[in-house]
Swiss-Prot record:
GO molecular function annotations of the record: ATP binding; pantetheine-phosphate adenylyltransferase activity
Family: Belongs to the bacterial CoaD family.
Alphabetized UniProt keyword annotations: ATP-binding, Coenzyme A biosynthesis, Cytoplasm, Magnesium, Nucleotide-binding, Nucleotidyltransferase, Transferase
A GO cellular component entry from the record: cytoplasm
BP terms from Gene Ontology: coenzyme A biosynthetic process
Regions crossing the membrane: none
Assembly behavior: Homohexamer.
Enzyme Commission number(s): 2.7.7.3
Protein purpose: Reversibly transfers an adenylyl group from ATP to 4'-phosphopantetheine, yielding dephospho-CoA (dPCoA) and pyrophosphate.
Binding annotation for ATP: 9-10, 17, 90-92, 100, 125-131
Residues that hold substrate according to the record: 9, 41, 75, 89
Residues marked Transition state stabilizer (site): 17
Gene of this entry: coaD
UniProt-recorded name of the protein: Phosphopantetheine adenylyltransferase
Length: 165
């Protein structure tokens, strides 16, 4: 079975993430969406909230080959422990590719048994990113249907509407 890992912070999960997961599931027998923590990032949602929201969204789509997990450690270690041979990374533009390629080189030097597959963003989601969603939320813009699913909008609105007033 060819399994792949699609790691990210998913703060919050966007239509762009969902599109990449769906496309990865066409290539691999199993895709694990891994909600990971990055100590260099500050998050809008807690790690539990990010995991639960990502899980709810993915499960609501009814995809049988896609699973959600969370991990607070080195992504390469998770892949090794779970016998996963591929890491899927989405790239929107050249600067994403440059960053992800550097990450691939480091991972390859640490363990060459795990390969990286780069998937370009679909045109429709080229400018969709979690940072943009967070910026819009902070500016009290909750009409985000082009960026995130309704389930995510409701969660963010209920969590932040009072804090931002």
């Amino acid at each position: 079975m060819r399994a792949a890992l699609f790691p990210g912070s998913f703060d919050p999960i966007t239509w762009g993430h969902i599109d990449l997961v769906k496309r990865a599931s066409l290539i691999f027998d199993k895709v694990i969406v891994l909600v990971a923590n990055n100590s260099n990032k500050s998050y809008l949602l807690s790690d539990i909230e990010r995991y639960e929201l990502t899980f709810e969204v993915i499960m609501s789509l009814g995809w049988t080959k896609i699973f959600v997990d969370k991990y607070d450690g080195v992504i390469l270690d998770y892949a090794l422990k779970n016998n996963i041979g591929f890491i899927v990374r989405g790239v929107r533009a050249f600067h994403d590719f440059e960053f992800e390629f550097e990450r691939y080189v480091v991972n390859n030097k640490l363990n060459s048994s795990i390969d990286t597959v780069f998937l370009p963003s679909s045109d429709k989601y080229l400018f969709v990113r979690s940072d943009l969603v967070k910026e819009l939320i902070k500016n009290k813009n909750f009409n985000l249907s082009n960026f995130i699913p309704e389930l995510v909008q409701k969660k963010l609105k209920s969590k932040f509407i009072d804090k931002l007033s």
